[in-house]
Amino acid sequence: KDSVFVSDLLREAKANELDATFSTTRLNHLIDKGYERITLQLDLGGESPGYLEKDKHYREADAALLNVIYPANLSKINTRRKEQVLKIVKKLAGPYGIKRYEKDNYQSANFWFNDIKTDTDQNSHAKREMSFIPSTEAEWFFDSWYAKSAAIVYKESRKEEYLNDSVQFMNRSLAQITGENMIGANGRSVPEMALPESYNYIHKSGTLHEAPSPIIPLNWSKASMTLMLKEMSNLINDEGNK
């Protein structure tokens, strides 16, 4: 699979007169370095755990690690490594969804009432950090992504725990579909039978109330659920034919 990637990239480079920059040896070296980085990060405990814990770049669990299992499907990442990813990311599961990472202030409690921009500039980041209420991170739609990833690992490992995880997170994902007369985290109505980007918290008088993000419906979350349901359907058919 990696060799196909290299040959395809070299062909495109040549077509765009960039082939002087690339070579098979160079690309294979870069691919190997990439795999070394992934395995090192996982052995250290997560996404970017090589920093001091007080460093803002330090991070163990990050939902983006699921990319290692799907859709990247990296040929040199074995089942044991994929199991590591699932165990790390599972720590981010909250009552309503999966956090991107701990202390993620984007769409955290009261985000939509604090006149905070979603921009990535330094001032916007600083304002979000100042208004962040601990343990109120947005919980994203990634349950469908996790369910599909767990199903993939179950097929490879045949370990019952991953089959159970795939069913559990599929059900969690389905529970994220909005019902009738729901109010979003910005205080406005949201459509029913729709998938939001995440579930957010509203903090009032010391109490937390969950509500769907006003970013709804989201094609990304719909696509992720579609891929999950297809994976689970295939899994059920495979199990039934045994």
Task: Give residue ranges: language-model regions.
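Extended ligand-binding clefts on enzyme/binding-domain cores
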Residues: 4, 8-141, 155
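Solenoid-repeat scaffolds in large eukaryotic assemblies
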Residues: 24, 81-82, 159-166, 238
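Residue-level detector of extended alpha-helical repeat arrays and alpha-solenoid scaffolds
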Residues: 28, 65, 143, 215-218, ...
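Active/binding-pocket-proximal capping segment
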Residues: 84-92, 103-108, 161-199
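Extended, compositionally biased non-globular segments
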Residues: 126-172
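CBM-like carbohydrate-recognition segments
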Residues: 131-139, 172-242
